[in-house]
Amino acid sequence: MGEEETIVNDENSSKPKPSPKLTLLPLVFLIFYEVSGGPFGVEDSVKSGGGPLLALLGFLIFPLIWSIPEALVTAELATSFPENGGYVVWISSAFGPFWGFQEGFWKWFSGVMDNALYPVLFLDYLKHSFPVLDHVAARVPALLVITFSLTYLNYRGLHIVGFSAVVLAVFSLCPFVVMALLAVPNIRPKRWLFVDTQKINWRGYFNTMFWNLNYWDKASTLAGEVDRPGKTFPKALFGAVLLVMGSYLIPLMAGTGALSSSTSGEWSDGYFAEVGMLIGGVWLKGWIQAAAAMSNLGLFEAEMSSDAFQLLGMSEIGMLPAFFAQRSKYGTPTISILCSATGVIFLSWMSFQEIIEFLNFLYALGMLLEFAAFVKLRIKKPDLHRPYRVPLNTFGVSMLCLPPSLLVILVMVLAAPKTFLISGVIIVLGFCLYPFLTLVKEKQWARFIPEETRPVSGVSSESQLDEEHGDESAASLLP
């Protein structure tokens, strides 16, 4: 790596060439891919909801009680703390570095689990045209090639990832616009009202809804790479909310309205390709399959960017060793990207449903901390500079966070015993990892970035944390 990489320290004054900042349009589509990527994966909501009615109502109501509150919280806190690290910095500022580290660990693990889905799903779409990919001998090398190729694209620069997200999103959404137009003559609105209460699977329904509408906060870990984040972030989040809702509702209304309600039981992952064939023919089916495959690439790129820059941000504030802050000549966090890619490869053996339930559980824990931090920072730091401020008082923001908090608790309660067990192991691992890293820092077994060379942070110094958070901060990873 030599001349291509550098690390922020007091001995090295040379820095990599600054990479171009993210502007509004690429950020909109990066957030779109963090959250959605298109209607691929929403088909299960029709099956688990017993028909179109609950699926359509879910994608109308859930954004109001979940997506919009989470987006508003993200808009205020990401602009107040415009740093790589995002929610880790928010939680540390509100509750101290111990809980900030736990938030980072849960969210990173959840994100890597989520990212492990996309190379697998990409191959699942391609195997319809290339059956050889169904065999392990071909599938494993293909999985590795895809993962390393996409990892290299991330390494080349965030602005390239942002531009790729725009191109991939346009390509992925176009076939659904065409499908909706072709479906109009055959739509019967009464079909949208069908529901078979005997076939409702509430756990599957809520997990599908939650998975397809979460991760609004992930882009906050890129805040340090955004041009004028105080103005750009709120606009990008607003645009992404509209784009996500439209990308779900329009295809669902077209497909369920144009086809008989007797097909509700057939709606599962990948069924939109069959819907396309029934509405437009084989050519539309092929287009949707290609769009689905490309969408998974966009999802992978957006998720890996957030995960890698989160590790970089945690290193910059002294939570992780300094090598996680190492940047390439393109301004990307090399070691952090490789760490996230390694996690993706190791987790790709898990099943689709297992991954969704595990990542939802860990993500839900993190969101409860974020909502609590949002309210506490309104009380604890009323004078904090907030370029964007949710126009509600403390009681109002508490009420804003109540419905989504109840929703994430419901998702956790509905989890399978296996999910509780494995998630519990991950939580205990995070609790043990924090004091271990504290010991590493005290013994100087690894170098951490000195406070005087760090970026300006919203996280308090150790003396302030001692006063604000009591004994817990005595083992702080932050000086």
From Swiss-Prot:
Transmembrane intervals: 22-42, 53-73, 86-106, 130-150, 160-180, 236-256, 275-295, 304-324, 332-352, 355-375, 395-415, 420-440
Keywords tagged on the record: Cell membrane, Membrane, Symport, Transmembrane, Transmembrane helix, Transport
InterPro entries: AA/rel_permease1 (IPR002293), RMV1-like (IPR044566)
GO MF annotation, one: polyamine transmembrane transporter activity
GO cellular component, one term: endoplasmic reticulum
Bilayer disposition of the protein: Multi-pass membrane protein
Parts forming coiled coils: none
Major localization listed first in the record, in broad terms: membrane
Pfam families: AA_permease_2 (PF13520)
Superkingdom of origin organism: Eukaryota
Name of the protein in question: Probable polyamine transporter At3g19553
Organism: Arabidopsis thaliana
